[in-house]
Each structure stands twice: as structure tokens, then as C-alpha cells.
Curated annotation (Swiss-Prot):
The lineage of its organism: Eukaryota, Viridiplantae, Streptophyta, Embryophyta, Tracheophyta. It is found in: Secreted, Cell wall. Its main location: secreted. One of its GO terms (cellular component) is extracellular region. This is 22 kDa cell wall protein. It comes from Solanum lycopersicum (Tomato).
């Protein structure tokens, strides 16, 4: 759930 996406 982060930016850049990954979680």
C-alpha cells in the first residue's frame, strides 16, 4: 500500500 506501488 505504498507509492510507488508494491504494497
Amino acid at each position: 500500500m505504498n507509492i510507488p506501488p508494491g504494497d
